[in-house]
């Protein structure tokens, strides 16, 4: 299914967004206008759900609402902004380890779950997993449950997206080694993407070292959960050496355009989040995804409210709205990821089923898809924790890795950036709807157009 916006309409919309022209939203101009400031990953929400919430807010309160939506491309960028109080924020959507750091720094408000009437729709397994991992947070001699500070938004796994027409069985058997082209597939040279994200890349490198029996001494018998959260000088050195070794096979580091390059057959392998992989597989039937046998990372992104949020009441209302099955599923379809609601709650909602059928999904296939709904209780999946006191050393290691061959890398970034900018402008002209996934880059309430997607 495709929907094409007329060129004239597109020019008007682009001009309105670019120059800040106000487009009437159909709400009474005389009503009081409240504001809600949201800081989220780019391309990580359906803009129509923002508009719907503004309308819902008016119906509930009799007041207009202006959602001011801005974006970040990594947890580290978000954390810097929050720690420096550089942004006015009511709602953030960090990953679990970033939530941990914010909680430890006493920067988040404990949620008032009496105001979250739909909280029972959340998949309890997520809270159980998170609280089991983050069981050592103590503030003022009181143990803190991370689940008291966030509501799950999206979740998934970290694995490998690949082109099955190019990748051979021996490449897959290499596990994370495929990112290092261990099976010596000449077609993969300079056709492999790695995430421009220290946390995701660190996980891949650590588990690759485990695959090839190259872990530092004494770590051989540790679980995946323990390994991906082992950050010391010895492990950092081993990871750095492995990542430098990988660079000759690399097409680039990315957080947004790699998936599109693989869909377009311009690259053949990439470290990928499961949601991006599902999107890509729907667009190119030659693509597939797997989590290597050695194990992987299961991640969770969630809504949190900063302690200094100017509008916490509206923030609670927004979180609760996104815990409604029909809202959650339509938003999940748009961005391609798995929402934090219990799948049985979703499956049991007639409205949710109708929405999935509207977008031509098979209901059983959707909810039984192992990429959307992996068994997160398995020991093969670890959850990332904050680097803690080793954060600066880890970041320095990552910068050294990226600096290797920097002249070539800078040129690649410039070329990639121009391509991304071109893609962002083109998105105003045509909106692609693939099984209901409208992948437009849309500016919401005069927020800047950005083309970055989820990363750690």
Regions found by a protein language model. Give the residues of each.
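A ligand-binding cleft/hinge motif common to bilobed small-molecule-binding domains
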Residues: 98-101, 269-286
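Paired acidic/hydrophobic, glycine-rich loop segments that form the ligand-binding mouth/hinge
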Residues: 89-94, 251-252, 268-273, 288-289
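Extracytoplasmic ligand-binding site segments that recognize negatively charged/polar headgroups
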Residues: 44-47, 103-261, 266
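Periplasmic-binding protein-like
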Residues: 119-121, 240-244, 283-307
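Conserved C-terminal helix/tail region of periplasmic/extracytoplasmic solute-binding proteins
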Residues: 368-455
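Early extracytoplasmic/lumenal segment of secretory-pathway proteins
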Residues: 31-105, 409
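Sec-dependent signal peptide cleavage junction
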Residues: 19-32, 427-434
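Mature extracytoplasmic/periplasmic domains
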Residues: 297, 306-379
């Amino acid at each position: 299914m495709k929907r094409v916006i007329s060129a004239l309409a597109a020019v008007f919309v682009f001009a309105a967004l670019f120059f800040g022209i106000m487009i009437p939203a159909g709400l009474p101009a005389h009503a009081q206008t409240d504001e809600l400031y949201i800081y989220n990953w780019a391309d990580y929400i359906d803009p129509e759900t923002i508009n719907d919430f503004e309308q819902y807010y008016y119906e509930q309160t009799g007041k207009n609402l202006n959602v001011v939506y801005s974006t970040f491309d990594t947890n580290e960028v978000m954390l810097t902004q929050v720690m420096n109080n550089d942004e006015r924020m009511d709602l953030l959507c960090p990953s679990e380890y970033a939530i941990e750091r914010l909680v430890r720094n006493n920067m988040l408000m404990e949620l008032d779950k009496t105001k979250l009437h739909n909280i029972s729709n959340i998949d309890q397994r997520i809270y159980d997993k998170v609280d089991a991992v983050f069981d050592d947070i103590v503030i003022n001699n009181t143990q803190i449950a991370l689940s008291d500070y966030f509501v799950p938004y999206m979740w998934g796994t970290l694995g490998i997206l690949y082109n099955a027409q190019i990748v051979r069985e021996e490449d897959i058997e290499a596990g994370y080694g495929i990112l290092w082209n261990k099976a010596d597939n000449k077609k993969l040279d300079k056709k492999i993407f790695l995430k421009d994200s220290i946390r995701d890349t660190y996980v891949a490198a650590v588990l690759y070292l485990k695959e090839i029996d190259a872990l530092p001494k004494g770590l051989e018998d540790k679980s995946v959960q323990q390994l991906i959260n082992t950050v010391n000088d010895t492990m950092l050195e081993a990871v750095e050496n492995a990542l430098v070794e990988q660079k000759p096979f690399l097409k680039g580091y990315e957080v947004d355009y790699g998936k599109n390059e693989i869909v377009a057959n311009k690259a053949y392998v990439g470290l990928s989040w499961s949601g991006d992989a599902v999107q890509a597989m729907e667009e190119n039937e030659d693509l597939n995804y797997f989590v290597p046998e050695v194990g992987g990372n299961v991640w969770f992104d969630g809504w949190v409210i900063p302690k200094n949020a100017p509008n916490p009441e509206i923030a609670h209302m927004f979180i609760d709205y996104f815990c409604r099955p029909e809202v959650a599923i339509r938003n999940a379809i748009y961005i391609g990821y798995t929402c934090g609601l219990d799948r049985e709650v979703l499956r049991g909602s007639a409205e949710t089923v109708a929405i999935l059928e509207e977008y031509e999904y098979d209901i059983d296939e959707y909810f039984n898809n192992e990429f959307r709904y992996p068994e997160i209780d398995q020991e093969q999946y670890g959850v990332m924790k904050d680097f803690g006191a080793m954060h600066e050393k880890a970041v320095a290691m990552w910068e050294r890795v990226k600096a290797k061959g920097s002249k070539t890398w800078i040129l690649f970034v410039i070329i990639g950036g121009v391509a991304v900018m071109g893609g962002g402008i083109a998105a105003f002209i045509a909106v692609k709807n693939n099984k209901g996934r409208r992948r437009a880059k849309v500016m919401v309430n005069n927020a800047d157009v950005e083309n970055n997607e989820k990363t750690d």
